[in-house]
């Protein structure tokens, strides 16, 4: 059973996140291992396994990027284990330039510049995410897979910038 079916949701990118949360809570109550404490060993094991599956499904579907990766996996794109990389030279050069800029910001310890950088990267991420939504809505799986790969780069860059922000705030 796929994660969307587990939560009673249609297998598409845009989902009702409130319904996801409510169904998660229901499933957690229904399959919590403590409810099976007096059951057989097989029942206890099944409850633990089901609870783990529910938690994994929840973590996957609640985050936009992992939800997209999972949806693509249902259509034959195993992005989680692939060695495939982005072939868009212009995008890769842009990423290299952004990484160098982040390194410069770290050296200068310029809080204002870092804040501006984080906002710019977030805008880039949001724009790509909107492209991804349209691609998934139109079942453009190949293009969507490439966009997810690019979003991973931006997500890592955003994470690095936020870690630098925390580091600079600790000084």
Swiss-Prot record:
SUPFAM superfamilies: Chaperone J-domain, HSC20 (HSCB), C-terminal oligomerisation domain
Domain of life according to the entry: Bacteria
GO terms for cellular component: iron-sulfur cluster transfer complex
Coiled-coil annotated residue ranges, if any: none
One Gene Ontology MF term: protein-folding chaperone binding
Record key words, sorted: Chaperone
GO process terms (BP): [2Fe-2S] cluster assembly; protein complex oligomerization; protein folding
J domain ranges (all copies): 2-74
InterPro entries registered for this protein in UniProt: DnaJ_domain (IPR001623), HscB (IPR004640), HscB_C_sf (IPR036386), HscB_oligo_C (IPR009073), J_dom_sf (IPR036869)
Entry function: Co-chaperone involved in the maturation of iron-sulfur cluster-containing proteins. Seems to help targeting proteins to be folded toward HscA.
Record-stated family: Belongs to the HscB family.
Oligomer and partners: Interacts with HscA and stimulates its ATPase activity. Interacts with IscU.
Protein name: Co-chaperone protein HscB
Protein species of origin: Salmonella heidelberg (strain SL476)
Gene: hscB
């Amino acid at each position: 059973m796929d994660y969307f079916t587990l939560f009673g949701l249609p297998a598409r990118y845009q989902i009702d996140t409130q319904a996801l949360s409510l169904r998660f809570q229901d499933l957690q109550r229904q399959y919590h291992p403590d409810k099976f404490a007096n059951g057989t060993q097989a029942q206890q094991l099944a409850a633990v396994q089901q609870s783990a599956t529910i938690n994994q499904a929840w973590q996957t579907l609640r985050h936009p990027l992992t939800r997209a990766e999972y949806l693509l996996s249902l259509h034959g794109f195993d992005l989680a284990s692939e060695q495939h990389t982005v072939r868009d030279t212009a995008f890769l050069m842009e990423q290299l330039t952004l990484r160098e800029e982040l390194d410069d910001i770290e050296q200068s310890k310029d809080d204002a510049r870092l804040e501006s950088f984080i906002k710019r990267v977030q805008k880039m991420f949001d724009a790509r995410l909107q492209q991804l939504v349209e691609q998934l809505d139109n079942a453009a799986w190949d293009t969507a897979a490439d966009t997810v790969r690019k979003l991973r780069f931006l997500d890592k860059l955003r994470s690095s910038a936020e870690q630098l922000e925390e580091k600079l705030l600790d000084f």
